[in-house]
From Swiss-Prot:
The gene is Tmem252. The chain crosses the membrane at residues 8-28, 39-59. GO terms for cellular component: membrane. Keywords: Membrane, Transmembrane, Transmembrane helix. Pfam families: TMEM252. It comes from the Eukaryota. This is Transmembrane protein 252. It is a multi-pass membrane protein. It is found in: Membrane. Residues 125-149 are annotated as: Disordered.
């Protein structure tokens, strides 16, 4: 009986909080009468509704956790019983880092061994690409691009040859349409 009463009270607090929030929103949004009294009631209902709603949520959560406390304790005890036993370790002196002088000797040995393995310098690269340069080439520099006026002249010549071979159906620098283009529309 006590369980059912607590559940009903929790549901009533949630419903009351929700209704108070809805009433506060309605009073604020209703345009029929904007009296001072309605606005004061609305601004009191909104926060009060939020407080009642949140307290109902936390109350229901607490009741559910309190009802199932024995289950949580049982699961926690089982989890703690299956934990690994703590391991005893032995602290050895070689675990600590080497002295400064010893670490320098190791770096020197590693550097000299690394150079001995390679035995040849890395390949040469150009500034413009990451492709290796061929040493057989006579010209180490890539070919320079043509100057701007030359590029414009070449582009204009190719456009003229294309227009001579086949007339373009694209609209040129005017608003006049050709007769064949009008017939296709």
């Amino acid at each position: 009986m006590q369980n059912r009463t607590g559940l009903v009270l929790c549901a009533l607090s949630l419903l009351t909080g929700f209704l108070m929030i809805c009433l506060g929103g309605f009073f604020i949004s209703s345009s029929s009468s904007h009296s001072h009294r309605n606005l004061v009631v609305a601004y009191v209902l909104l926060p009060l509704g939020f407080v009642i709603l949140l307290s109902g949520i936390f109350w229901g959560t607490y009741r559910q956790a309190n009802d199932n406390k024995e289950m949580f304790n049982h699961v926690l005890r089982q989890h703690l019983a299956f934990q690994d036993l703590p391991l005893a370790t032995v602290d050895r002196p070689d675990f600590y880092p080497p002295a400064y002088e010893e670490s320098l000797d190791v770096e020197k040995q590693a550097c000299s061994a690394g150079r001995g393995l390679l035995g040849f310098p890395p390949p040469l690269y150009t500034e413009t690409s990451l492709e290796p340069q061929d040493k057989d080439k006579n010209d180490p520099q890539p070919e320079a691009p043509p100057p701007y006026p030359e590029n414009i002249a070449v582009a204009a010549a190719t456009v003229k040859t294309q227009d001579a071979e086949e007339p373009s159906t694209v609209l040129k620098a005017g608003a006049v349409l050709q007769l064949s283009e009008l017939a296709s529309c």
